[in-house]
Amino acid sequence: MGQSGRSRHQKRNRAQAQLRNLESYAAQPHSFVFTRGRAGRNVRQLSLDVRRVMEPLTATRLQVRKKNSLKDCVAVAGPLGVTHFLILTKTDNSVYLKLMRLPGGPTLTFQISKYTLIRDVVSSLRRHRMHEQQFNHPPLLVLNSFGPQGMHIKLMATMFQNLFPSINVHTVNLNTIKRCLLINYNPDSQELDFRHYSVKVVPVGASRGMKKLLQEKFPNMSRLQDISELLATGVGLSDSEVEPDGEHNTTELPQAVAGRGNMQAQQSAVRLTEIGPRMTLQLIKIQEGVGNGNVLFHSFVHKTEEELQAILAAKEEKLRLKAQRQNQQAENLQRKQELREAHKKKSLAGIKRARARADGDSDAEDPGAPPEAVGAGQPEDEEDDAEYFRQAVGEEPDEDLFPTAAKRRRQGGPLGKKQRGKEQRPGNKGRGQGGNWQALKLQGRSQRGKAKPRPRATHQDSRPASRRRN
């Protein structure tokens, strides 16, 4: 049998291709789209629709809780490679969209004057075109009328361009372009039009009947006598299926595109179908950092040079105080560490001195040593103390007072009263001295059995004399 599975070179090439795909995917911009505060049902749905526009380079199932702060989101975004935040908020006046560039900013704040959800856009169309395969690739970004009106316009254009991966027009695969995001700037009203379209490429130069035959859904020709009626006159087609093409949407394809009749170097028409959402935006302000920096531009508030200098001085003072607190905290930590090390050295030195003192003093008692070891060094002193106690008191000392002396007395010293009494009994011999120990034991039992029992006290006698009846 032949070798099963892939060869070594195939496995290596496959692993290298997967690694290249992961690296290219990580290099692309990623985004988080979520709401903050009490946004409401419609604004939350708008955030989901905007998240739909940003697919697939966004977190489609992102859930941000009320207790999660913006710092938490920024901390999570770093390891995940997220580069942009799109945050929707709602106030009593209007709805706002914040576009943030991570990790250092800037932050663009837009006011959403008008918006329309995806479901409303789709329901208003007679024939909509939207399927899941369109969202497997990021949309094509088209910026219109972003001229040299000012630095804030250029910054807006750069921010929108960085939201999506760059495209090389010479190497791009046209089959990956299924959607288009159009952002149009109106210099007169200073508003942005946000539109999202579905892209479809169809061949031109064919009749309506031929286009119908090229579609996946075959037309109904039950009323026709011949196929020529469909190709020549287009009988049986509704007026809604008429889509006039012209020079405004006709182009020559540089490569073959998926679809019937879309051949290379042939004329085809590019058709756009809006899939939503729609938004009308107006730039409010531009800030440094992630939402808490200096205001670089404001559409309604204009500050003088003195006010800007005062704001800059206040910020520098705030940064100086922050640095001072950080330095003081670092000094406190260093001082505590030095105190801890000094205390540790002092404790170790004290332990060494105690051990040296214990080793040099033979009379010192070891607290962990057993009692036998404690008294082994001075048995003669305890014997003298016990003898002095006998002479002074006239009684034998307790065993707890002089344990070593008591132990020696039990082993080979003078006998006690009980032991002397046992030795003085007649016929009392030990087991090893030939005495009839068993006979003595039985005799003792028989004598105890013959002992006269004591009279039991009656109930009347046991009572007190004052309660007895006469």
Curated annotation (Swiss-Prot):
Chain segments carrying region Disordered: 240-264, 323-470
Residues with Phosphoserine modification: S238, S240, S362
Domain Brix: 29-292
SS bond partners: none
Protein name as catalogued: Suppressor of SWI4 1 homolog
Pfam families membership: Brix
SMART domains with a match to the protein in the record: Brix
Basic residues: bias regions: 342-355, 447-457
Gene source species: Mus musculus (Mouse)
Molecular function via GO: rRNA binding
Superkingdom classification of source: Eukaryota
Keyword Transferase tagged: no
PROSITE patterns reported for this sequence: BRIX (PS50833)
GO biological process: regulation of cell growth by extracellular stimulus; rRNA processing
